[in-house]
Amino acid sequence: MLRVLHRAASALVMATVIGLAPAVAFALAEPTSTPQAPIAAYKPRSNEILWDGYGVPHIYGVDAPSAFYGYGWAQARSHGDNILRLYGEARGKGAEYWGPDYEQTTVWLLTNGVPERAQQWYAQQSPDFRANLDAFAAGINAYAQQNPDDISPEVRQVLPVSGADVVAHAHRLMNFLYVASPGRTLGEGDPPDLADQGSNSWAVAPGKTANGNALLLQNPHLSWTTDYFTYYEAHLVTPDFEIYGATQIGLPVIRFAFNQRMGITNTVNGMVGATNYRLTLQDGGYLYDGQVRPFERPQASYRLRQADGTTVDKPLEIRSSVHGPVFERADGTAVAVRVAGLDRPGMLEQYFDMITADSFDDYEAALARMQVPTFNIVYADREGTINYSFNGVAPKRAEGDIAFWQGLVPGDSSRYLWTETHPLDDLPRVTNPPGGFVQNSNDPPWTPTWPVTYTPKDFPSYLAPQTPHSLRAQQSVRLMSENDDLTLERFMALQLSHRAVMADRTLPDLIPAALIDPDPEVQAAARLLAAWDREFTSDSRAALLFEEWARLFAGQNFAGQAGFATPWSLDKPVSTPYGVRDPKAAVDQLRTAIANTKRKYGAIDRPFGDASRMILNDVNVPGAAGYGNLGSFRVFTWSDPDENGVRTPVHGETWVAMIEFSTPVRAYGLMSYGNSRQPGTTHYSDQIERVSRADFRELLLRREQVEAAVQERTPFNFKP
């Protein structure tokens, strides 16, 4: 156990950022010595799953297929109902299995050819990896067969699942949620669980650490709802590889992964890998280069479950243009979607090869296959190499910036039809920079390290925007650039930063103006803000008021620039914006914020953690940390308050792991919402109190550690 207090972390961050000696000292273990080679991994002689006290499966397999089988079995035990539902959707049978609520998803996936393409992709896997996919599916089936009462009757019809189902789910998640989403194509915008995605990542080189060991932060921020973004923690060991980390349920490979030699993490990068084309309809077809072209119209249908349990066949009218499948928006606009990477069946195997690479060269060779369609990927290893890659399948475009390609692109001319994509070497990347770290917090790829090593002028303008970097992203750069001699403990403390950077940038102008306002309530609010330490801690009495003011000053998502005296500039990407352009207007906004805070929370000085609660099952504990656009590096997005002024997380920290590549590796982390959501589980709310206390648990890699913590053993036999 390693506990890091919120206040201690805040004090440490403040001290280091302003250049003072650290105000807090942690009880540290002796520095780990670093032999020339990592310790040998445990080599299993039998197949078994050892479950620790937090429901984490430590899966030991005599070979790769056995480990994948055990991993499928473990996922089914922990999340079986949800995985089967996701697999049923990816088959294009959600409407048939569960009715009209799934009809739009079914139409989206069938029109885009996901189930059919998944069958093709499955056949294109290498024989060895196809065997792993089959084994993973077999593990899911075996759990369901052995424990039929633990699987909801609603989803049993999906069984048995196949390796092709595994591919279909991964294909849907990556290519038709992350890269192309129905909301963007249909003009409805992304749903909150997709739009609010975010993550933090750091990799630190040995020269910037106290013990000469590289450090890595894995810290995805996603929706807390139960869906395709729910994370699962696991540990796989065979004689040939070891993988620890987390990934979305239903995936057979761990994307946020590490072992005794190396680790990787991912953040959403916003690469525009899909293009939505506005078609001009004419004479039953569409205009293209001055000619009317007919649509391709393949025959298709699907089944729809009725309220009485029967199903009916429904015809599906599919139209395809030269660009891709065509959809009709609510306003009648015909939109064709073209998705890059539909010729890349090897995403899962590439991830597996990346996280089992024996060297950075091997890792880069796997990355260069360009099968992973999107994401920033950050790497660190025991040899001291760190790397940031703005990864993804990026179309080569002859003209236009990213704003043009994010919108509706004219579909009546071949000048906008892309046919090629960029190789890895064309994309922004940094390896072992002079600053000694790489980072990304969903910012564009222009400040992956500090000082910067390239500029936007070095790349096509359609790759990434030159728009304001969020205050969270700016804080990420500052926390790394302004801190040296990092230990793992200090690294963990910095990860807990929940400073309101926007308060630092605005309160010096707002408070003096509010103090001279004739309204006593405004003056009292100004004094409250002046006494605030500008941290989103549970005992803060001004944080809720500031949040309400910032919502008026910078907009509902806290990202507006108009109110600042000095707007964001690419020339000063981590110190702008700042100042208040119109102090009088800002004071009027404070006046409104006072009323809003009272209405929502009962008082302007209600403690932050009294209103912001971590509630799962019967656990109800105070929360800390805030919105990333306010500058909090540790992120929680809160629901609207209820009638009692209480709100809970809807998005934010899910999996967090901090790794030191010592010998042996040391790692600490948490899965905020627990490691299982299957009915009857005891591992849904069992980590939330630790989240509230910032009490990270040690992640157990060595066999002796696992044996000391084991709560249950599951031996298994696997025969392909």
Curated annotation (Swiss-Prot):
**Which region is the signal sequence?**
1-29
**GO MF entries:** glutaryl-7-aminocephalosporanic-acid acylase activity
**Could you say which enzyme class this protein belongs to?**
hydrolase
Q: What induces it?
A: By glutaric acid.
Reply yes or no: does the keyword Hydrolase apply: yes
EC number(s) reported in the record: 3.5.1.93
Q: Which residues form the propeptide?
A: 190-198
Positions of the catalytic residues = 199, 221, 653
Entry keyword set? Antibiotic resistance, Hydrolase, Periplasm, Signal, Zymogen
Note the subunit structure.
Heterotetramer of two alpha and two beta subunits processed from the same precursor.
What is the documented function of this protein? Catalyzes the deacylation of 7 beta-(4-carboxybutanamido)cephalosporanic acid (glutaryl-7-aminocephalosporanic acid or GL-7-ACA) to 7-aminocephalosporanic acid (7-ACA).
- What's the protein here called? Glutaryl-7-aminocephalosporanic-acid acylase
| Organism this protein belongs to | Pseudomonas sp. (strain SY-77)
